[in-house]
Amino acid sequence: MPVQGSQRRLLGSLNSTPTATPHLGLAANQTGARCLEVSIPDGLFLSLGLVSLVENVLVVTAIAKNRNLHSPMYCFICCLALSDLLVSGSNMLETAVILLLEAGALAARAAVVQQLDNVIDVITCSSMLSSLCFLGAIAVDRYISIFYALRYHSIVTLPRARRAVAAIWVASVLFSMLFIAYYDHAAVLLCLVVFFLAMLVLMAVLYVHMLARACQHAQGIARLHKRQCPAHQGFGLKGAATLTILLGIFFLCWGPFFLHLTLIVLCPQHPTCSCIFKNFNLFLALIICNAIIDPLIYAFRSQELRRTLKEVLLCSW
């Protein structure tokens, strides 16, 4: 994805030197300020991408195989896995191509590399946007299932879910193409940051409201069975811990990347900001880590999906 100082990374690899920074790193700070730069080895970067790729392929395969999982909720989970798969796959492809170019093992004209870079950028950006959208869609789906339980199947139908999925993919591709074309405009970067904050607020509000309803429900059950208050408090603490982990992982994995975009707009030449820019590889690795964690949170907790996944793995042997 084009960002200040790292755009056209594949083209830069055609004339690379042994000190060139691979995939998505920014130029070294020229101000002389001491910076903390976390180096992400190419092997680690590719390994994270491979783990994410395998995990999300398994999720998509299991949902596609089991007709019992062809519901709106699993439709969103499947699309989230597909988005995460594309995030990991596109970055693995870019890293591999850059390494091959730098090693001289791949010969390509600049025009071909330019087109490949553009395609990878669009895939990466659109899959990131769609991943955020599907995280929000899953939160909305769960909210409706709790607060409108009796009407859920009439509100969230499979045709509506499919239309929502199609709209998300189309919008993600279109906006990613706009971003790639106008990445040097501050308004475009700020729109991406606002979009991330909107998704964060949406998820926080919905999940906090769901936690409050669950605590009220648990309290009602405790009163019905004349239980003591500590049982309800324990449920509330467990729910709060789960919510903190869910939102915390989302913020920690995605936040640094969007902080990077914000600082490009606010202080592109400031020494401190330049130090942060040098850790862009780390920020991207965190997003790939989120792609690894998403299946654990949203998919593998389903007993039906785990059973189907076991069948898929046994059949593959």
UniProtKB/Swiss-Prot annotation:
Covalent lipid adducts (S-palmitoyl cysteine), residues: C315
InterPro entries listed in its UniProt record: GPCR_Rhodpsn, GPCR_Rhodpsn_7TM, Melcrt_ACTH_rcpt, MSH_rcpt
Gene Ontology process terms (BP): adenylate cyclase-activating G protein-coupled receptor signaling pathway
Keywords, alphabetical: Cell membrane, G-protein coupled receptor, Glycoprotein, Lipoprotein, Membrane, Palmitate, Receptor, Transducer, Transmembrane, Transmembrane helix
An annotated GO cellular component: plasma membrane
Main location: membrane
Membrane topology: Multi-pass membrane protein
Family matches, as SUPFAM superfamilies: Family A G protein-coupled receptor-like (SSF81321)
Extracellular side: 1-37, 94-118, 184-191, 267-279
Molecular function (Gene Ontology), one example: melanocyte-stimulating hormone receptor activity
Glycosylated residues in this chain: N29
Domain of life: Eukaryota
Transmembrane intervals: 38-63, 73-93, 119-140, 164-183, 192-211, 241-266, 280-300
Places the protein is found: Cell membrane
Ranges per topology, Cytoplasmic: 64-72, 141-163, 212-240, 301-317
Pfam families: 7tm_1
Subunit structure of this chain's protein: Interacts with MGRN1, but does not undergo MGRN1-mediated ubiquitination; this interaction competes with GNAS-binding and thus inhibits agonist-induced cAMP production. Interacts with OPN3; the interaction results in a decrease in MC1R-mediated cAMP signaling and ultimately a decrease in melanin production in melanocytes.
PANTHER family assigned: G-PROTEIN COUPLED RECEPTOR
Family per record: Belongs to the G-protein coupled receptor 1 family.
Function, as annotated: Receptor for MSH (alpha, beta and gamma) and ACTH. The activity of this receptor is mediated by G proteins which activate adenylate cyclase. Mediates melanogenesis, the production of eumelanin (black/brown) and phaeomelanin (red/yellow), via regulation of cAMP signaling in melanocytes.
Name of the protein described by the UniProt record: Melanocyte-stimulating hormone receptor
Organism: Chlorocebus aethiops
